Amino acid sequence: MTIVRIDAEARWSDVVIHNNTLYYTGVPENLDADAFEQTANTLAQIDAVLEKQGSNKSSILDATIFLADKNDFAAMNKAWDAWVVAGHAPVRCTVQAGLMNPKYKVEIKIVAAV
């Protein structure tokens, strides 16, 4: 059994790959942005991670989106809808959660085929 851990630190790895399946969680870089921009930024990070591993967003199997404020649901969906590949939407769950950094409006966890 081979598990590849990319940029592993003491508490987490940036990316884990096992059995041609990639696991990744992204958080926004611009903490002063609104929910739409934070979501778009996080989705762009997901694109970059997938591309680096020879995959793309149409190969995402599952996405869990954590929102700090449920009132940001429409803004997050606007960014998501502009990004997701028509006909290739993954299973998706959106949860309101108290995120660890109070400036995070969104955090996105994905599982993708690689």
Swiss-Prot record:
Write one Pfam family the protein is assigned to.
Ribonuc_L-PSP
Q: What Gene Ontology cellular-component terms does the record carry?
A: cytosol
Q: Name one GO biological process term.
A: single-species biofilm formation
Coiled-coil regions, chain positions: none
Membrane-spanning residues = none
Similarity comment: Belongs to the RutC family.
Matches recorded under PANTHER family: PTHR47328, RUTC FAMILY PROTEIN YOAB (PTHR47328:SF1)
According to UniProt, the name of this protein is: RutC family protein YoaB
Q: Which organism is it from?
A: Escherichia coli (strain K12)
Q: What's the encoding gene here?
A: yoaB
